Structures are given as C-alpha cells and as structure tokens.
Amino acid sequence: MTAPSQVLKIRRPDDWHVHLRDGDMLKTVVPYTSEIYGRAIVMPNLASPITTVDAAIAYRQRILDAVPAGHDFTPLMTCYLTDSLDADELERGFHEGVFTAAKLYPANATTNSSHGVTSVDAIMPVLERMEKLGMPLLVHGEVTHAEVDIFDREARFIDTVMEPLRQRLTALKVVFEHITTKDAAQYVRDGNDYLAATITPQHLMFNRNDMLVGGIRPHLYCLPILKRNIHQQALRELVASGFTRAFLGTDSAPHSRHRKETSCGCAGCFNAPSALGSYAAVFEEMNALAHFEAFCSLNGPQFYGLPVNAGWVELVRDEQQVPENIALADDSLVPFLAGETVRWSVKK
C-alpha cells in the first residue's frame, strides 16, 4: 500500500458481510456496494430465506441485474441454515460454486431470523459435512435466551455454543461475524487458523453511549448492539495490531426511514456509502494505516482461499458530507453518518 498524506491506494477490497435485501430496496442499495467492492458475501436472510441452490441462483441473478454497467462485482452467495436443511443440497451448492459459505442464525437473533437454528445439535450432520468440504460457517454469535441480557449475549455464546462447537469439529472453518466485545476479540486472537472475524465500522467508531446519551439515535441501532467503550477499544486494538484473521465486513443493513424511526424500530445500519472511508479514519486514528489494506483487501481472501482482487481503489483526504437521506420509491433511507462530514472518501 502506498500512503501519501492525501491518498490511500489499496487493492480493491471485498465486503465479507452485507445485506442487499430484495425488490426495489435491492435495486437502490446494490450500486453502493458494487461500485467499491470486488466481491461481497451476501446474507441469505430474506423474508423467504435462501435455503436451496435454485433460490440462491435466482437471488444472485437479481443482484447482478441491479449492478450498474461498468461495475465489476461478484456476489458470493450463502445458504441459510435451518433445523431441516438438506446436507446434500448444501454440498451440491458448494460444489457447483453457488454457495460460498453457510450462515448460522440462532432463531430470532436478528432481522428475518425466525427460521434460524434452534440448537447446534439439530444441524450437527450438516456442520460435519461442511467440515469435510472445507466450507466456511458464518456465525451470528449471540444466544437468544430471554433471561440473558442483550449486552451479554455474545460473551455467553462463546462459552455455551462457539467453543463447544469448535472443540467438537476442530477443522471447521468459522467466521465469527460482526464481533462486538473484548471477549470475542480475545477469543478470535487466541484461536487457530480455522477461526476468523469480521468487524463493522460502527462497532469500531461508536459505543453504546453514542447511541443512548442525549437522546436515542435509532440509526446507530444494530445487532449485535453497540457495547461499552472497553469493548470498542478492544476491537480497535485488534485491527490496529495487524491481526490477519480479522477483516472487513460492513454488515450494511438497510431499512427504510419509517422502519427505523418508530416506537419499535428495526436493527441495522446502512453504511455501504461511507464504510470504507470510515474504516480508513479508524486506522488513521490508531496510527495503523500500514495495516489498512490487509484488513480491507488481503485477509479475507486468504481465509476464504480466494485470489486477491486485481484492481485498485484510491481514497482521498477530501472532506465530504454524507447525504441526509437516499430516496426510495415510497420512503427514504438514512445512511450511516447521515449529514456528517467524513475525512476520507473513495475517489470516483
């Protein structure tokens, strides 16, 4: 990476965790990802989850149809794990190059996860098949028991689900997605080469005070929820250290304004327009720009066993204001950092 004071030039990055939705929303949000990233791991939690090869092929085509001319973008599809998923269908999708990975949502952990897994034991034959195939398991790492405080769900998941699973299937490749706690940061750091993590810009930039003090800020509400400052700092220190098994995963998750600004709002930050510049700002603040390219563009492909993108992206130190909103057919989207000035932006 070359890093003059005003320009950052890096290999074209990938987004290893994104929600592109469907229908009109998909058509609106896809270009914000396809313009910047060479590839993206696409989450399968649509209203009708992606559980079959045919459904994934059809969804992939809808995504590709929404990619503007001139954008070189490859969506990497994932399979939504359910208690009744057919392991043969999953293996077929992996061998045919349709499924890159499979996603484990604990039932009711986040948006459109009611079809999720009730217990790891229920899908153990599928996970054993994935271990044999070398197919990555992507994990939303939170327990959903009613008695567990929402701020403790990730740490509890490590102890009661993640560690027993990894002890049982020692060669299963696992991505601990959107980690939010010092517990998870330490767990991944202490893990072996079969364990990696993605980290979002919002969890690096903010903590729960930013969301709750002086008025509630619904556009910072996401799941896993923002945690204490000590957890934010642990994540920042992990990426600043140059740790090679952590990589970019925005978890960009658009919801229309009326579904966010309501008495029972949806979880998710639509950060695709400003995420790369947000990451750059964090690395700069941590005096860690030397590790920025690896986090964005190299660590993910290394873990997934994929080639690094051939192209390049330049970020320029050019203060720009994030739009207040983005028009939808019958509503609007409020992007992450709406109305705020960002230091780094992608050169068009």
Swiss-Prot record:
Essential cofactor(s): Zn(2+)
One BP annotation, GO: 'de novo' pyrimidine nucleobase biosynthetic process
Positions of post-translational N6-carboxylysine modification: K103
A molecular-function term among this protein's GO annotations: zinc ion binding
GO cellular component: cytosol
Cofactor binding mode and count: Binds 2 Zn(2+) ions per subunit.
Domain of life per record: Bacteria
Sequence positions that bind Zn(2+) 1: H17, H19, K103, D251
Keyword hit for Cytoplasm: no
The protein, known as: Dihydroorotase
Native organism taxonomy: Bacteria, Pseudomonadati, Pseudomonadota, Gammaproteobacteria, Enterobacterales
Family according to the record: Belongs to the metallo-dependent hydrolases superfamily. DHOase family. Class II DHOase subfamily.
Quaternary structure (record): Homodimer.
EC id: 3.5.2.3
Organism: Salmonella dublin (strain CT_02021853)
Pfam families linked to this entry: Amidohydro_1
Pathway: Pyrimidine metabolism; UMP biosynthesis via de novo pathway; (S)-dihydroorotate from bicarbonate: step 3/3
Family matches, as InterPro entries: Amidohydro-rel, DHOdimr, Dihydroorotase_CS, Metal_Hydrolase
Entry binding sites for substrate: H19, L20, R21, N45, H140, L223, H255, A267
Its biological purpose: Catalyzes the reversible cyclization of carbamoyl aspartate to dihydroorotate.
PANTHER family: DIHYDROOROTASE
Binding site for Zn(2+) 2: K103, H140, H178
